[in-house]
Amino acid sequence: MSDVQQEIDQLVKNNDIVLFMKGSASFPMCGFSGRAVQILKACGVDTKALTTVNVLENDGIRQGIKEYSNWPTIPQLYVRGEFIGGSDIMMEMYQSGELQQVIGGNAA
């Protein structure tokens, strides 16, 4: 496992909710990342409790997260070490109530 992969692995495993995105929760840099943050807020997640990783600040992470998850796009959500998906999957899961259940006790 490369250093970047190890760094990603530690972020995913050591934080309950991790969103790899473009920008930050307070200033998303793309519509999909912004939508992902809004979905999490709608689920009751306090953005202070949310770990976000701005992939625009680190090309290694930007490419590495795609390899780590075998998923080609950003944003990517992880809850308790499990890859959930991008903003489209998050929206589908939110609309069905499944995302709220997955997040569960982590909502603030």
Label the model's feature ranges.
Residues 4-6:
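Eukaryotic intrinsically disordered and solvent-exposed regulatory patches
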Residues 9-47:
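Local sequence-structure signature of Cys/Sec-based thiol-disulfide redox active-site neighborhoods
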Residues 20-22, 53-58, 80:
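Structured beta-strand/turn binding interfaces of compact recognition modules in eukaryotic regulators
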Residues 45-62:
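Thiol-based oxidoreductase modules, predominantly thioredoxin-like and allied folds used
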Residues 67-73:
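Thiol/disulfide oxidoreductase modules built on the thioredoxin-like
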Residues 79-108:
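Non-catalytic, surface beta->alpha helical segment in thiol-disulfide oxidoreductase systems
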